[in-house]
């Protein structure tokens, strides 16, 4: 089901949040309890949903459809999707309703669908920035794709909000773009999340 977006202005970017019908949270479905099974009561972390196999760096793409296709492929190859074609269609339908280029060279496409098996993220940095019809008009070089199962209650919005919070910091985004390996990319995120948890 495509989501309808609303915008919340922040100091650096206009962050796209989806309404409550399009969010994923950790209550209710088995997917929602994926971290409870590990006895983990800490707040959700981006690194819980992102692994090196779903990070691609300095990718060369012609447009946002190619970037989304590449990220869907990573989700599919790592067993996160029931139907990659259906999920990609869902993401593109959501994109047609309003750009997920949130500003500052960042885009957060997303889709909630029964084509998704488990909540997951994929991420890419681009060798050359692409036009994304972003809210601030800036071309995009950093993308995160959020995948949510249809039955996952509000996880979608939680992940959007968490990503938006982290990506508001220009230096953080620059560190991600400069990462030379997927492991380094994830380490940048983990370091930032650990710093916030320690506050």
For every predicted segment, state its role.
Residues 11-21:
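Cationic, amphipathic, low-complexity segments that mediate targeting or membrane/lipid association
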Residues 19, 23-199:
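Cytosolic covalent-transfer regions centered on His/Cys nucleophiles
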């Amino acid at each position: 089901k495509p989501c309808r977006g609303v915008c919340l202005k922040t100091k650096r970017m206009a962050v796209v949040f989806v309404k409550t019908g399009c969010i994923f949270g950790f209550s209710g479905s088995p997917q929602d309890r994926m971290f409870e099974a590990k006895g983990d009561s800490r707040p959700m972390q981006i690194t819980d949903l992102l692994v090196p196999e779903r990070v691609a760096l300095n990718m060369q793409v012609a447009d946002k459809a190619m970037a989304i296709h590449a990220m869907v492929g990573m989700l599919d190859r790592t067993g996160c999707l029931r139907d990659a074609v259906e999920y990609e269609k869902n993401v593109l339908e959501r994109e047609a309703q309003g750009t997920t280029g949130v500003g500052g060279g960042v885009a957060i496409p997303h889709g909630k669908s029964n084509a998704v098996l488990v909540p997951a993220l994929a991420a890419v940095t681009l060798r050359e920035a692409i036009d994304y019809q972003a809210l601030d008009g800036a071309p995009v070089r950093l993308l995160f794709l959020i995948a949510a199962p249809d039955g996952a209650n509000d996880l979608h919005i939680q992940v959007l909000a968490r990503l938006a919070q982290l990506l508001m910091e220009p230096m953080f985004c620059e560190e991600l773009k400069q990462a030379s390996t997927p492991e380094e990319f994830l380490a940048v995120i983990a370091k930032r999340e650990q710093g916030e948890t320690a506050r």
